[in-house]
Amino acid sequence: MNKGWLELESDPGLFTLLVEDFGVKGVQVEEIYDLQSKCQGPVYGFIFLFKWIEERRSRRKVSTLVDDTSVIDDDIVNNMFFAHQLIPNSCATHALLSVLLNCSNVDLGPTLSRMKDFTKGFSPESKGYAIGNAPELAKAHNSHARPEPRHLPEKQNGLSAVRTMEAFHFVSYVPITGRLFELDGLKVYPIDHGPWGEDEEWTDKARRVIMERIGLATAGIKYEARLHVLKVNRQTVLEALQQLIRVTQPELIQTHKSQESQLPEESKPASSKSPLALETSRAPVASESTHTDGVEEVAGSCPQAPTHSPPSKPKLVVKPPGSNINGVPPNPTPIVQRLPAFLDNHNYAKSPMQEEEDLAAGVGRSRVPVRPPQQYSDDEDDYEDEEEDDAQSTSSAIRYKRKGPGKPGPLSSSGDGQLSVLQPNTINVLAEKLKESQKDLSIPLSIKTSSGAGSPAVAVPTHSQPSPTPSNESTDTASEIGSAFNSPLRSPIRSANPTRPSSPVTSHISKVLFGEDDSLLRVDCIRYNRAVRDLGPVISTGLLHLAEDGVLSPLALTESGKGSSPSIRPSQGSQGSGSPEEKEVVEAVDSREKPGLVRPSESLNGEKYSPKELLALLKCVEAEIANYEACLKEEVEKRKKFKIDDQRRTHNYDEFICTFISMLAQEGMLANLVEQNISVRRRQGVSIGRLHKQRKPDRRKRSRPYKAKRQ
């Protein structure tokens, strides 16, 4: 019974004619090009063609794999038409029969009606034998198949169409008794995908299942809306950092403002003993980075001048204490100041208070963008350095260890146990970041910092940044970072890549606040960080709200599953006001849970978080933004490929072929090519097949005398 079934091509016209040959009336097969669009008109089932990944021999065997979605109840399985495929090359007919014989309102015709009545209550194996023993089905099937060649050349440059089609398989998706079933003749049981929603049709459920199977499920996510929500949340986290510093240390703002008004920055030596010792870092760095054109002058906290950084670790540029500035001899032991009592035993508040003073004293200063921006890399070694810093932060005289000589840290120490903060621009980074993000939330945000009176500022955009390596320039974008929540691809190898940037905002702020990226600010800090654990699951699906008291909480979703961009009212005056307006969600995107995270309870209560926790959350938001940017870019490229393939498929090549053949004939080359092609076919084609047929009986005749002699 398994002889003579041929391969069928995946063509809707072929399937429609085959259905008519079965005797079915009022049914046609159409090809689907867009799984995101709803299907128009009544749909009886889906036929899905996919590549069969197992060996060719195993296609004749029914897979015995069973999972939790397999229906093993004999009553349910026998009451539907589900047949095991026991015949090779019959999967197309099996797929059509699985759809047609499970429909109650289709005119099946005499052949299929008789088949349905005869196999009622049969097991899947018995139904498979019934299909194989139906000559009407085999005849209709083979009438639309391409005839197999009687011979195959010994050498072929490529696979034939028949051999290529043998690697593909047809399965059906059919609604049966309110549930979606996947009927695959090569599986021992049907697969139950469950019921569909009350407000949707069964085709919506089937399209989702098929999209998940072929890896296009993410196409349903509105990446633009997710990116918008993430960038608004990034702005909110930056506001929370700014507000936390403003609330915790308000007295330092007026202190430093008065200091800046009394003494200009350029006249202060490197060994200045001011209470905050901010000018210690500004003078050397500003003097070293000054250019004649007055455009590129770098503050102490700005990550500029990549030639001072190793390729894989763009550090903050701080001039070593052994250099002369404006003729003033350097002081080998600068005075350091102690942190406030409530922050003295923590490592997460090294300089944000001093940065607030810069903000208060530097509002309204001119900001000149820099031409060569800096590239940031995701380097794990930064975390190791920070772990070394944490191990030494318990002593009163805090020393910050570095891996190599000539790499001064953001802090310097002396014998009197005072702490000198050398990074003065954290709040300016936050404030300018917020200001830029309010202008356009749909483009990558930029950092702008100002170092103080009399010195220009530097703008570090987050896009189009060169590699830290001076010799080459990277074309990678920030979208290549893995997601903080749903990307398992993060590894030390990827992180050590100098062309793979991390968030410029998070990298810079964390280095300003903590010296370097803290060990708890890794992307894999979900299990250890409270802010990431609480807000991580909803960071891309809902907006965050920052209260006046510093409480950060997610807003309740009013309308979920719309897939449209949320409408918000952005906060105003984020630079000068510590109480931004509330953000309200009109429409929220689909809130799908991310793997590896536990969704918090429905009643989400806001909490206050430390600067370290907020920076960890900020880094995760940046990584999630980069992940969605990569996905969006991938979808755009995929659409381009779809259009190219469609144009290639629908293009009429006949005119080109006729023109080419005419040109060959005009040049007198056509006759020679035809003759050569005929001679090749004679050597490798029909003659070889005939010789094989004649050699087989000859070999048997020759082998018998040899066997007789041996006996």
UniProtKB/Swiss-Prot annotation:
Keywords: Chromatin regulator, Chromosome, Coiled coil, Cytoplasm, Developmental protein, Differentiation, Hydrolase, Nucleus, Phosphoprotein, Protease, Thiol protease, Ubl conjugation, Ubl conjugation pathway. Residues 377-391 have a biased composition (Acidic residues). Residues 681-683 are annotated as: Interaction with nucleosomal DNA forming a DNA clamp with ASXL1. Ubiquitinated: monoubiquitinated at multiple sites within its nuclear localization signal (NLS) BY UBE2O, leading to cytoplasmic retention. Able to mediate autodeubiquitination via intramolecular interactions to counteract cytoplasmic retention. Monoubiquitinated on at least 4 sites near or within its PY-NLS. It catalyses: Thiol-dependent hydrolysis of ester, thioester, amide, peptide and isopeptide bonds formed by the C-terminal Gly of ubiquitin (a 76-residue protein attached to proteins as an intracellular targeting signal). Residues 695-711 are annotated as: Positively charged C-terminal extension (CTE). A motif (Non-classical PY-nuclear localization signal (PY-NLS)) lies at residues 699-706. Residues 580-596 have a biased composition (Basic and acidic residues). Residues 269-278, 563-579 have a biased composition (Low complexity). The record marks D184 as: Important for enzyme activity. The modification Phosphothreonine is found at T475. Deubiquitinating enzyme that plays a key role in chromatin by mediating deubiquitination of histone H2A and HCFC1. Catalytic component of the polycomb repressive deubiquitinase (PR-DUB) complex, a complex that specifically mediates deubiquitination of histone H2A monoubiquitinated at 'Lys-120' (H2AK119ub1). Does not deubiquitinate monoubiquitinated histone H2B. The PR-DUB complex is an epigenetic regulator of gene expression and acts as a transcriptional coactivator, affecting genes involved in development, cell communication, signaling, cell proliferation and cell viability. This is Ubiquitin carboxyl-terminal hydrolase BAP1.
